[in-house]
Amino acid sequence: MIITIDGPSGTGKSTIAKALATELNFNYCNTGAMYRTLAYTHLQEPWQALPIKELIDNPPFSFSFISGQPLEAFLEGQLLSAELGTQEVANAASKLSQLPEVRSFMHKLQRKYAELGNCVFEGRDMGSKVFPDADVKIFLTASAEVRASRRLKDLPENSLSKEALHAELVKRDEADSQRLHDPLIIPEGAIILDSSDLTISQVLEKILALVSPNLP
């Protein structure tokens, strides 16, 4: 069974998808972390000067695809975690994700991960492009102001003001929805959930009610 959760940044996709996978005992794939791994790698020496095509043809990074364990990212064997959470990496990932060769590379990896069976995928084009035949498709949304407040809590103190982060989110929304290849759209057949005024538990409860009739 494949469940996809798409939506813009700050809607709670990662938190919800991870909690849902835990509740259902499904595998969880944070596809945003995959793009951020590439972006982080490209920001480091000696890979900074490499063309992206060369970097993805011979990637120094890798991902763990192990059933029952969350996807983990490694750079030359070293586990990446907090390094992927900076705004610099997020901005770089947004730019790289517009490249068709990058999206094709990532889509192949994501479909490979799906071979584990019973997966929750979260991202921006999971239900529209990568898994259009997913069993359940969710599109999470929230106001830009609420999303900025949420993202601010995840960033180091004083790294960005709420106003600056709000502007970054609006800019990211435009880039994601207007990009030529696989833009952020509401997938056909997806159920739209506005999480602006809902807690994580409330959103999870709603999704579980939608998923339960489809469980194997």
From Swiss-Prot:
List of residues binding ATP: 7-15
UniProt keyword terms in alphabetical order: ATP-binding, Cytoplasm, Kinase, Nucleotide-binding, Transferase
Record flagged with keyword Nucleotide-binding: yes
Entry EC number(s): 2.7.4.25
GO cellular component, one term: cytoplasm
One term of GO molecular function: CMP kinase activity
Pfam families: Cytidylate_kin
GO biological process, one term: pyrimidine nucleotide metabolic process
Keyword Acetylation listed: no
Main location: cytoplasm
Coiled-coil stretches noted in the UniProt entry, renumbered to this chain: none
Location of this chain's protein in the cell: Cytoplasm
Origin: domain of life: Bacteria
Catalytic reaction equation(s): CMP + ATP = CDP + ADP; dCMP + ATP = dCDP + ADP
Family membership: Belongs to the cytidylate kinase family. Type 1 subfamily.
UniProt protein name: Cytidylate kinase
